[in-house]
Swiss-Prot record:
Family to which this protein belongs: Belongs to the RemA family.
Name the UniProt record assigns to this protein: Putative regulatory protein BH2513
One Pfam family matching this protein: RemA-like
Entries under PANTHER family matching the protein: REGULATORY PROTEIN SSL2874-RELATED, REGULATORY PROTEIN TM_1690-RELATED
InterPro entries found in the cross-reference section: RemA-like (IPR007169)
Amino acid sequence: MNIKLINIGFGNIVSANRIISIVSPESAPIKRIIQEARDRNMLIDATYGRRTRAVIIADSDHVILSAVQPETVAQRLTSKDDLEGEA
């Protein structure tokens, strides 16, 4: 089993195999998901005090906040897939 890791900013790395979705934090439903994760102690804040630009939802019900744009995280995710396919 290959473990693919994705850099989500500031040296923080998550397993690509565990990511369910990468979304913007602007909508009310996502804000509710963040608050519920905080209440359940399942929130991981990887923003280093910066503005949250991406919310990553993992298959373990963890919610990860990142200061990197969702498009950037998705691009890193797909570029890692492309590199693995060539090997």
